[in-house]
Amino acid sequence: MQAARFIFTGVVQGVFFRASTRERALALQLRGHARNQADGSVEVVAAGSAAALEALEHWLWQGSPASKVASVTRTPCAIPTTEAFVTG
């Protein structure tokens, strides 16, 4: 199992980005979270297979129908302790 932390900027808050991310992450059998940040970005921490993380990253560039992702930063991180994928 691998884990990654993504920071997304652009129009990613108030456009169902986190809810859509949760749906996609669950479909890919990932665990972790998606959280709004004070600076207007969204943090996504996800853990699972390397292929599932790649698929999530690819999908997240599109995000929800109303989102407009401007940039993505990906860094390795510790595997989250949660067994589910949550938004907050």
UniProtKB/Swiss-Prot annotation:
The keyword Oxidoreductase does not apply. InterPro entries: Acylphosphatase, Acylphosphatase-like_dom, Acylphosphatase-like_dom_sf. It catalyses: an acyl phosphate + H2O = a carboxylate + phosphate + H(+). The active site is at R18, N36. Its EC number is 3.6.1.7. Keywords: Hydrolase. Gene3D superfamilies: 3.30.70.100. This is Acylphosphatase. It holds the Pfam family Acylphosphatase. Residues 3-88 form the Acylphosphatase-like domain. It comes from the Bacteria. GO terms for molecular function: acylphosphatase activity. Belongs to the acylphosphatase family. The gene is acyP. The keyword Hydrolase applies.
